[in-house]
Amino acid sequence: GDALAAPESHENKSVPVDTVPAYNETEPTSAPFDVSFEVGMDFNDGKPIVRVKTNLPEGTVFMINFISPINWGGTGRGGDDTAEVSPAGVAEFRPLTDQGEALPPAPYQVTINTIGLQPENVRSVMGEKGKNLTGNKVSEFNFGLGLEKWISQKFILEVHQDGSIAVK
């Protein structure tokens, strides 16, 4: 193969071939990533199923946490779950329940966050401590070790006496 010969400018034998993939792997860490993040819900007979539609990579792990605060007239109970983003760009959580039963009438504070420990393919997009993340769902805080950024969405889920559910 003469057709496969490298151009003369690249014939420096001191550059190992395996530096090319390493460069390509680290390249995305400097690119800002504008996050799209949309929450949807099926009411599911008082056991709401919450899902997130996002452009974050497959395998991104989200955590959902919900509580019915006593000072809002609630039970003080709640729960949490994690879900991974599917190839279709959706993370779906298990139904939100009160110890397996339909949620009793009360307001519930619901928070959805990305968790700190993410797969390698996700970390390469988010960047170290989430530094690449941009968009209106990005929260940031300096914990004393530098700025950290993550995705966060909070909302109030109101379960009414008639079993209907409203989102505030």
Protein language model features and the residues they cover:
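Generic structural signal for short, flexible, solvent-exposed coil/loop and linker residues
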Residues: 24-28, 51, 74
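Short edge beta-strand/loop segments characteristic of extracellular beta-sandwich folds
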Residues: 49-55
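N-terminal low-complexity, Pro/Thr/Ser-rich intrinsically disordered segments
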Residues: 3-42, 168
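Ser/Thr-rich low-complexity repeats and stalk/linker segments
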Residues: 30-37, 44, 55-156, 160-168
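Short coil/turn motif common to extracellular beta-sandwich-like domains
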Residues: 43-49
